[in-house]
C-alpha cells in the first residue's frame, strides 16, 4: 500500500550551490525531509528550506555534485529530519550526519526525535547551579563552569583550541556522580588530521566510553555543518532529560557553522547582513545555545562549551559578538600568552562566567573560592599594569611592593595558567596553588579576602623568608 505522505517527483528545475529547486510540486511543508535518488542509485538526504504552493527549494546535505536535473528522483517524506537515539551511542563515533564511522553497526533506537528539538519552557527552567570540574585552573578557579550554563571559548587561527577542547572533554567531571556524566562532542569543518587527533585522544584516555562523537570533516559538504550541532544537541537532550545524566556538549568550530549559513544565504540570494552573514544569524545561533539548561523536576542538565575562532582575532566580528549576547560569559584565548609558550593561553582578564556564583562556595568547591578569585583578578590586573609601565619607563621607579606584584604576575602566568595538557587539577589543587601565589604579597594587600580565610591559608612570611622579595 502506498503511503500518501510520500510524494515522488522526477527532475529538478535548477541547481544553485548546495540547493536545488523543484517546480510543479504540491503540499510540501517547510523543514520536510527529501530523499534524492541519483540516476546511478546513490541516495542523498535533503531538507526543504523554502516552499510555495508550486515550488520547493531543498538543501542537499551531501552536496549537489553529479546531480542530473532530468533524471534525479526526489521523494518527500512528509516529516522533519530525525535521529535514532539510544544510550548505546555512548562510546560511538559518527559522521556529521549521524552515520557510524567506527566500524560498528547502526544504532538500534530506543526512541526517534526531531533534531530541532523542543524549546524549554522558560517557566520550567531551573537556574543553573553546581559546578563541572574541567581540571584546568584558569577555568575552574577564575571562570567556573556551572551545570546548565553555556560558556563559549573565543579563539583565533593557530591557537590550541582543539587541544583545549579535547582536554576539557577528557577531564570534565561532576564531583561524586561519575556514573551520571557524559560528553557529546561535535566538530565541524575539521581536517582528517584533527579528526584522527580527537579519536586518538578519547580512545587512549578511556574517555570515549562516556562520549558520543560527531565529526564533520572539511571536505564534507558545508551544508552538512548545519545539522551536525543539532544532531549532537538532540542526543544530549535525550541523555540529559530521558536518562538523567549531566551532559557536557562541546561544539567546535561554530565559525565554520556560520560560514555554512552564509553560503546557503548567498545561494538563496538573500539580502546580506553584517559581513555577508544572513540577518537571522542571531536567531539561528540562539536556537543552538538556548538548548542548554536544566528543567525543574528533571535530574539531568545540558552544559554547552561552544568554541569559535575569531577572524583576525576580532572579538567584534559578528559570530563572537552575537554569541556574547546569548551566552553567559566567555573564555578568551590570548595570542600573546601563546607566543610565550603558555598552555592553555587563557587571558583571564577579559574572561567571565556570569553564573559562577551558583557553582562555587561551601559544599560545592570551597568556602574561600569566591574571595580568592576576586583577589587573583585584582592582583593580576595590577601586575599587568605595572609591567606595561616598566616597558615604557623601566624598573627604576618601582617600589618593593610593585616588584612583588610583577613577581606575582609572572608566577600567575607560569604556575597557575600554565599547565600540561594531561594535568588534571582538582578544585582544591587550584585553590591551594592560588594561595601559594597570593602569599607572595604582603598580608595587608589581600583586601578582598576575609581575615578568617587569611588565617587559615596565608603563609606569606615563610615564602618571603625563603625566596626574598
Swiss-Prot record:
This is A-type ATP synthase subunit B 3. Has multiple subunits with at least A(3), B(3), C, D, E, F, H, I and proteolipid K(x). Keywords: ATP synthesis, Cell membrane, Hydrogen ion transport, Ion transport, Membrane, Transport. One of its GO terms (biological process) is proton motive force-driven plasma membrane ATP synthesis. It is found in: Cell membrane. Belongs to the ATPase alpha/beta chains family. The gene is atpB3. The keyword Mitochondrion does not apply. GO terms for cellular component: plasma membrane. It comes from Methanospirillum hungatei JF-1 (strain ATCC 27890 / DSM 864 / NBRC 100397 / JF-1).
Amino acid at each position: 500500500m502506498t503511503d500518501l505522505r510520500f510524494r515522488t517527483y522526477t527532475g529538478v528545475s535548477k541547481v544553485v550551490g548546495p540547493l536545488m529547486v523543484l517546480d510543479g510540486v504540491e503540499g510540501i511543508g517547510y523543514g520536510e525531509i527529501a530523499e534524492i535518488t541519483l540516476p546511478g542509485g546513490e541516495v542523498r538526504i535533503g531538507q526543504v528550506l523554502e516552499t510555495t504552493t508550486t515550488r520547493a527549494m531543498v538543501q542537499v546535505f551531501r552536496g549537489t555534485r553529479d546531480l542530473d536535473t532530468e533524471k534525479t528522483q526526489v521523494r518527500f517524506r512528509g516529516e522533519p529530519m530525525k535521529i535514532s537515539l539510544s544510550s548505546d551511542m555512548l562510546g560511538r563515533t559518527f559522521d556529521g550526519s549521524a552515520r557510524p564511522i567506527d566500524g560498528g553497526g547502526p544504532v538500534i533506537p530506543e526512541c526517534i526525535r526531531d533534531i530541532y528539538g523542543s524549546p524549554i519552557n522558560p517557566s520550567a527552567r531551573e537556574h543553573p547551579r553546581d559546578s563541572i570540574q574541567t581540571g584546568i585552573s584558569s577555568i575552574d578557579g577564575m571562570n567556573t563552569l556551572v551545570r546548565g550554563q553555556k560558556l563559549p571559548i573565543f579563539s583565533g587561527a593557530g591557537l590550541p583550541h582543539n587541544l583545549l577542547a579535547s582536554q576539557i572533554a577528557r577531564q570534565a567531571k561532576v564531583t561524586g556522580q561519575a556514573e551520571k556524566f557524559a560528553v557529546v562532542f561535535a566538530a565541524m569543518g575539521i581536517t582528517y588530521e584533527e579528526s584522527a587527533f580527537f579519536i586518538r585522544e578519547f580512545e587512549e584516555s578511556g574517555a570515549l566510553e562516556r562520549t558520543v562523537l560527531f565529526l564533520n570533516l572539511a571536505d564534507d559538504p558545508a551544508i552538512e555543518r548545519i545539522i551536525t550541532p543539532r544532531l549532537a544537541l538532540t542526543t544530549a537532550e535525550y541523555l540529559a532529560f530521558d536518562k538523567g545524566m549531566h551532559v557536557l556538549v562541546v561544539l567546535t568550530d561554530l565559525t565554520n557553522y556560520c560560514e555554512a549559513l552564509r553560503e546557503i544565504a548567498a545561494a538563496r540570494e538573500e539580502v546580506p547582513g553584517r559581513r555577508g552573514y544572513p540577518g537571522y544569524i542571531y536567531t539561528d545561533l540562539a536556537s543552538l545555545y538556548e538548548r542548554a539548561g536544566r528543567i525543574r523536576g528533571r535530574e539531568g542538565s545540558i552544559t554547552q562549551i561552544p568554541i569559535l575562532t575569531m577572524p583576525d582575532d576580532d572579538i567584534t566580528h559578528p559570530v563572537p559578538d552575537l554569541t556574547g549576547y546569548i551566552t553567559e560569559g566567555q573564555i578568551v584565548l590570548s595570542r600573546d600568552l601563546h607566543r610565550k609558550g603558555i598552555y592553555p593561553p587563557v587571558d583571564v582578564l577579559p574572561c567571565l562566567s556570569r553564573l559562577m556564583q551558583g557553582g562555587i562556595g561551601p559544599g560545592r568547591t570551597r568556602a574561600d573560592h569566591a574571595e580568592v578569585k576576586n583577589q587573583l583578578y585584582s592582583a593580576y590586573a595590577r601586575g599587568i599594569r605595572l609591567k606595561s609601565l616598566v616597558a615604557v619607563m623601566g624598573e627604576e621607579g618601582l617600589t618593593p611592593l610593585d616588584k612583588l606584584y610583577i613577581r606575582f604576575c609572572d608566577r600567575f602566568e607560569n604556575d597557575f595558567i600554565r599547565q600540561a595538557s594531561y594535568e588534571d587539577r582538582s578544585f582544591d589543587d587550584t585553590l591551594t596553588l592560588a594561595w601559594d601565589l597570593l602569599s607572595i604579597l604582603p598580608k595587608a594587600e589581600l583586601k578582598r579576602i576575609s581575615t578568617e580565610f587569611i588565617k587559615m591559608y596565608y603563609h606569606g612570611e615563610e615564602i618571603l623568608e625563603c625566596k626574598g622579595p
